[in-house]
């Protein structure tokens, strides 16, 4: 599991997640979320194009990021969803919550 945070422009941050996002890897993501939230970004793009699998704990971490950023007045966009992660987002109707 790899997490990469990069600044796209002033106030815009991209979080790229690669591999599998499950109960084992979520603690690492939560650390990145804490660091990212501390900067109070106006927009967070979550790049899931290299995410192969997500379980309920992974979805919970993504929703947690969404709530934190929205609570600070920011926007969260999910890009690159495909395969199993896309099916999970649709099943949970998160495609209605996130701009995908």
Residue map of PLM features:
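Amphipathic alpha-helical interaction surfaces in cytosolic regulatory modules
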Residues: 20-97
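Short beta-strand/loop segment at the start of cytosolic alpha/beta domains
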Residues: 1-16
